[in-house]
Regions:
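Short internal beta-strands
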Residues: 87-90, 201-209
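Cofactor-binding active-site loop characterized by glycine-rich and histidine/acidic residues
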Residues: 24-36, 40, 44-52, 63-197, ...
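Active-site flanking residues adjacent to catalytic metal/cofactor-binding acidic residues
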Residues: 177-180, 206-207, 338
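Generic beta-sheet signal
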Residues: 85-87, 171-173, 202, 332-340
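Generic start-of-chain signal for non-secretory N-termini
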Residues: 1-41
Length: 365
């Protein structure tokens, strides 16, 4: 559920305008983002490594899937959403949702400590079993996404037939979805129904980390997404590069760097993300070493800085994310394709087996 008016004052919201938060507010949002990442990771860590267990079996959880969605959910809940908005959170990001609700004071520590156990916070958002403000149950991938479209149409029907409360604002319906949810047929059935009935005030935010339980996503999926959604009248916004990369593209050799990233396969990009700065440097030297400006770029960045630059995707850059969200000016359905990294800012980032991977005690310390 969207923040109530008192809770939302933690970060000044500018939804529906072309302005961005001031630097102090942006710092606050990024601090909240870090808290949400640690707390969501800890929920899963506690359930698997700390909480007493009778049988010692793995409880499970998806730390990498949470990490890819933290920036997007922080931006939405702490800056963009209004009280009348409703949200479906992708199943595997349930710990991030619970962490944010805890920061709002709507979730208890006891519930977090009992995550994935009887009576505790649920593995996937549940309206019937969770104690915090879940708007849509999203336990089976794809179902929550489709439900948001029909909810938007029902909300329109209620208003058009004079059944809404007097003065009740017409909020948005938002789905934060995983890219693998586009494998579900009901999502495309819903899209067609929305086109038939002129759905409005609907946002689908795709956490485009390009990794799933089944493997690395096809390299050309984005173009298919753009085609599918454009055909049924949606506005498609590609949120691909963060501000660090955007700045680098303006420097000598920047065009070649952007082309290299654009043509880099999802599989190679994930592998380099896991391997780190030295691996990025080696590949860039091999492929672009003779390109004017690239040597200077590499010399100006140590391995850590180069890794930060090359992984500065739009879905992890708070400023770029807020620019995309806060510049929507009308009620046309919006599809945000937010490029992210599965496991971002954790040791799991980019690893081929990170879908159900768990950080160990040393990595969580």
């Amino acid at each position: 559920m969207a923040p109530s008016k008192p809770a939302a004052t933690a970060a000044k919201r500018t939804a529906g305008s072309n302005t961005l938060p001031d630097p102090a507010t942006l710092d606050t949002l990024e601090a909240i983002e870090r808290k949400a990442l640690w707390l969501s990771s800890w929920l899963i860590h506690n359930a698997n490594h700390i909480r007493p267990s009778r049988d010692g079996l793995k409880v499970g959880g998806h730390q990498a899937s949470c990490a890819s969605a933290v920036t997007l959910l922080t931006a939405l809940y702490m800056n963009v959403l209004k009280p009348e908005d409703r949200v479906a959170v992708k199943p595997h990001a349930s710990p991030v949702f619970h962490a944010i609700q805890y920061l709002f004071g709507r979730q208890t520590r006891d519930q977090l400590e009992r995550f994935r156990s009887l009576g505790g916070a649920q593995s996937y958002p549940s309206r019937t079993k969770d104690s915090d403000d879940v708007d849509f149950s999203t336990g089976s991938v794809g179902l929550g996404v489709g439900a948001t479209l029909f909810a938007a149409m029902v909300r329109d029907y209620v208003r058009l037939h004079g059944l809404a409360g007097e003065g009740e604002p017409n909020g948005r319906i938002v789905a934060l979805m995983g890219d693998a949810e586009l494998d579900e047929g009901n999502v495309f059935e819903a899209l067609l129904e929305g086109w038939k009935h002129d759905v409005r005030n609907l946002w689908w935010v795709i956490d485009y980390n390009r990794q799933s339980l089944d493997g690395v996503v096809h390299d050309y999926l984005f173009q298919r997404i753009k085609d599918f959604f454009g055909t049924v009248g949606w506005n498609v916004i590609e949120l691909k590069y963060g501000k660090l990369l955007q700045t680098a593209f303006e420097e000598p050799g920047g065009g070649a760097l952007m082309n290299w990233i654009d043509t880099c396969s999802n599989q190679l990009y994930s592998a380099l993300t896991f391997q780190g700065g030295a691996a990025w440097r080696s590949h860039l030297k091999t492929d672009l070493g003779r390109t004017k400006g690239i040597k200077a770029l590499l010399d100006d960045h140590d391995d850590d800085a180069l890794h930060r630059l090359m992984t500065n995707l739009g879905g992890h850059d708070m400023t770029a994310t807020l620019e995309a969200f806060n510049t929507v000016a009308d009620d046309t359905p919006q599809c945000f394709v937010a490029y992210t990294i599965k496991g971002y800012n954790t040791p799991l980032a980019g690893h081929k087996d990170n879908h159900s991977g768990l950080m160990n005690l040393e990595q969580m310390a």
